[in-house]
Amino acid sequence: MATPPKRFCPSPSTSSEGTRIKKISIEGNIAAGKSTFVNILKQASEDWEVVPEPVARWCNVQSTQEEFEELTTSQKSGGNVLQMMYEKPERWSFTFQSYACLSRIRAQLASLNGKLKDAEKPVLFFERSVYSDRYIFASNLYESDCMNETEWTIYQDWHDWMNSQFGQSLELDGIIYLRATPEKCLNRIYLRGRNEEQGIPLEYLEKLHYKHESWLLHRTLKTSFDYLQEVPVLTLDVNEDFKDKHESLVEKVKEFLSTL
């Protein structure tokens, strides 16, 4: 296994102004409101940038933000690995989780060389992290018998190695936890109408909610990355629609950032 950091020591990524780029992960259940939230943050400051989840790559659909990018080999094959995972989780969970993490690492690393290089007080917001990939979603699939013992062992070994190679550049300064009930998330799944997600049962969301609570609220979830225990967490209750509460949310985020 990769040797985890022994203390909280974020990576030294800096802007051209000489200011270290703060890296914040936005975490939460499926349909908690992460995409809406990161769009609010993106518009709040020129010194802030967001890295959305690469859902388009998982679905073989180029989003408007990524029209300039060439299709990867896996996209050209025409596979919707997200839909495949939901339809046959025992067959495709290992494949999906491996590719989800790989595409996330690629997107987040690429963002470090983006517009924030010229920012005065740069902050980079990730929509989820490599840690929730493993300790929330992949582990839940393993515990639900959608990954067998061999697949889970290989996934953990692969995840450890990937983080030993690239993880220092992606280490977090803080986490924002968008907290919503599983019932509210299920309702939002129906409302946003993403075809691949329409068969998700409440029980699945409840399991993910429990893991998020253990990790970010109670801080009892154990990981291989010691420094995560010291990363500050801002918890925001998002059960209510927050589309009309932009200013309040942004102020809470600014206050949180000032403490980091």
From Swiss-Prot:
Description of post-translational modifications: Phosphorylated and activated in vitro upon phosphorylation at Ser-74 by CSNK1D/CK1.
Chief localization: nucleus
Residues at which ATP binds: 28-36, 188-192, 240-242
E.C. numbers: 2.7.1.74, 2.7.1.76, 2.7.1.113
GO molecular function: ATP binding; cytidine kinase activity; deoxyadenosine kinase activity; deoxycytidine kinase activity; deoxyguanosine kinase activity; protein homodimerization activity
InterPro entries: DCK/DGK (IPR002624), Deoxyribonucleoside_kinase (IPR050566), DNK_dom (IPR031314), P-loop_NTPase (IPR027417)
GO cellular component: cytosol; nucleoplasm
Phosphoserine: residues carrying this PTM: S11, S15, S74
Active-site feature positions: E127
Protease is among the record's keywords: no
The keyword Nucleus is annotated on this UniProt entry: yes
GO term, biological process aspect, one: dGMP salvage
Phosphothreonine, modified sites: T72
Top-tier EC class: transferase
Reaction(s) catalysed (UniProt annotation): 2'-deoxycytidine + a ribonucleoside 5'-triphosphate = dCMP + a ribonucleoside 5'-diphosphate + H(+); 2'-deoxyadenosine + ATP = dAMP + ADP + H(+); 2'-deoxyguanosine + ATP = dGMP + ADP + H(+)
Subcellular location: Nucleus
Key words, A-Z: ATP-binding, Kinase, Nucleotide-binding, Nucleus, Phosphoprotein, Transferase
Residues that hold substrate according to the record: E53, Y86, Q97, R128, D133, E197
Top-level taxon of the source organism: Eukaryota
Family: Belongs to the DCK/DGK family.
PANTHER family: DEOXYCYTIDINE KINASE (PTHR10513:SF19), DEOXYNUCLEOSIDE KINASE (PTHR10513)
UniProt function note: Phosphorylates the deoxyribonucleosides deoxycytidine, deoxyguanosine and deoxyadenosine.
Subunit structure: Homodimer.
The protein, known as: Deoxycytidine kinase
Organism: Mus musculus (Mouse)
